[in-house]
Design a protein with these regions (language model features):
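Conserved core of the sugar-phosphate nucleotidyltransferase
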Residues: 34-126
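Short phosphate-binding loop-to-helix
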Residues: 1-44
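Short beta-strands and strand-loop turn motifs
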Residues: 24-27, 55-57, 120, 147-151
Length: 181
């Protein structure tokens, strides 16, 4: 099982008085270069979108290398911002990549209403979730309710390989926010 399941289990072990509309925020550990305003962005979107049970931070992809990287989850949403699909493949299909392309990526910060998280914990993993190794697709395949929380592009790197770790360690040394922690 994936991130949704681990978050639900952790909340139930640590938060004994949680109520159905309480908000749970998940920050994935492979995203060490997050900016504090990213957290408030997913929470604000959750409160502003009446139909949202979850929000996920999304950023424009600005280079073709990220677009083709299977470790970076790409995201497609409808005109209202509701997430339609997440993939490790380059989506949407682009004849030619440009910095102004529609391509977006997931940045590993999510906000959930507790009842929504509980609902998806009780739902079996979906076919597309298993194929893509992306549990957000369980939400997409089961009545949805997850919205993208758009965030302006900031230089960010996920840590999926040793090469990524070396790159991020060098970037963090120069990062103004990391120095404050």
């Amino acid at each position: 099982r994936g991130c949704l399941d681990r978050v639900y289990e952790a909340v139930n072990k640590t938060c004994k008085n949680i109520k159905k509309n309480d908000v749970v925020v998940c920050i994935q550990g492979d995203e060490p270069m997050l900016h504090p305003s990213m957290i408030s962005t997913v929470i604000k979107k959750l409160f502003s979108e009446k139909k949202a049970g979850a929000t996920i931070l999304g950023m424009q992809i600005v280079n073709e290398q990220q677009f083709k990287n299977k470790n970076i989850l790409k995201i497609v949403n409808d005109s209202r911002g509701e997430v339609l699909y997440c993939s490790r493949s380059p989506i949407p299909y682009l004849k030619k990549f440009t910095k102004k392309s529609y391509a977006k990526r997931i940045y590993g910060i999510f906000a959930f209403r507790y009842y929504f998280l509980k609902k998806y914990f009780k739902t079996a993993p979906s076919i597309l979730e298993i194929i893509e190794s992306c549990d957000q697709n369980r939400i997409c395949e089961n009545n949805r309710g997850m919205y993208i929380a758009p965030f302006r592009f900031v230089e960010s790197y996920s840590v999926d390989t040793y090469k990524d770790l070396k790159l991020v360690n060098n970037k963090i040394k120069k990062d103004t926010w990391s120095k404050k922690y």
